[in-house]
C-alpha cells in the first residue's frame, strides 16, 4: 500500500465491490461491443443526474425487475467509461481519463444534467485551450451558451489571429456557424 492512503484503499475497494454487486442496469455506448456493457446502479446514476432519475422513475424502468441495458448513442465507449467512473467518484476532480475526453464529457454533462461534471470539464477545457482546439471549444460553448468558456475560446482565437486566417478549421466553423466570423472579427478588432 506504499503510496495509497487507507482511505483511498478503502474507497477503491468499496467501489470495486459496489460495481460488481447488485447491479440493476447496464450501459452501452454507440461503439460498444455486445459483451462490453458497463454495469451500474440506477440509484447512483440517479443521485448524480436528474435525467437518469426521471428515466428510472418512469413506468418503463420502475416496473421492470430484469437487468436493463441502455444504449447512450451519443457517447463512445471510452467516454462512457469515464462518465460512469465520475458518477461513482466523489466528484472533486476529473480523472486522467476524463481529462482526455473533456469535450465529450462536457456535452454529456449538459445532456444528463450533471452540474459538477460540467463545471470540472469547463475548467479543464479552459486550462487546455490552444489554437488547435479553440474553434471546437467555441462551438461547444454555444448551445447552451456558456459565457466563461466562450470568452476563453475567443481570447485564444484573438491571441492567435495570424494563424487563424488560413486555417481549414475556420472554413468548417464558418459553414456550421454563419455568425461565427462576425463574432470572431469583433473579438479580434473591438470597437473603441
UniProtKB/Swiss-Prot annotation:
Keyword Transferase belongs to the record: no
UniProt keyword terms in alphabetical order: Ubl conjugation pathway
Ranges of residues in domain BTB: 23-96
GO biological process, one term: protein ubiquitination
Domain of life: Eukaryota
Pathway: Protein modification; protein ubiquitination
Keyword hit for Transmembrane helix: no
Domain notes: The BTB/POZ domain mediates the interaction with some component of ubiquitin ligase complexes.
Function, in words: May act as a substrate-specific adapter of an E3 ubiquitin-protein ligase complex (CUL3-RBX1-BTB) which mediates the ubiquitination and subsequent proteasomal degradation of target proteins.
Protein name: Putative BTB/POZ domain-containing protein At4g04090
Amino acid at each position: 500500500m506504499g503510496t495509497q492512503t487507507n482511505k483511498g484503499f478503502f474507497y477503491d475497494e468499496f467501489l470495486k465491490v459496489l460495481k460488481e454487486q447488485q447491479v440493476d442496469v447496464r450501459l452501452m455506448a454507440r461503439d460498444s461491443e455486445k459483451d462490453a456493457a458497463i454495469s451500474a446502479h440506477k440509484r447512483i446514476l440517479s443521485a448524480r443526474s436528474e435525467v437518469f432519475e426521471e428515466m428510472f422513475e418512469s413506468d418503463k424502468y420502475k416496473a421492470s425487475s430484469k437487468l436493463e441495458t441502455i444504449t447512450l448513442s451519443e457517447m463512445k465507449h471510452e467516454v462512457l467509461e469515464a462518465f460512469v467512473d465520475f458518477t461513482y467518484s466523489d466528484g472533486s476532480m476529473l480523472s486522467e481519463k476524463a481529462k482526455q475526453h473533456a469535450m465529450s464529457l462536457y456535452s454529456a454533462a449538459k445532456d444528463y444534467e450533471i452540474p459538477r461534471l460540467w463545471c470540472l470539464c469547463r475548467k479543464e477545457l479552459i486550462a487546455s485551450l490552444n489554437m488547435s482546439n479553440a474553434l471546437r471549444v467555441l462551438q461547444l460553448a454555444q448551445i447552451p451558451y456558456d459565457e466563461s468558456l466562450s470568452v476563453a475560446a475567443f481570447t485564444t482565437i484573438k491571441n492567435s489571429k495570424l494563424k487563424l486566417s488560413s486555417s481549414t478549421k475556420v472554413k468548417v466553423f464558418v459553414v456550421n456557424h454563419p455568425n461565427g466570423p462576425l463574432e470572431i472579427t469583433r473579438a479580434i478588432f473591438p470597437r473603441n
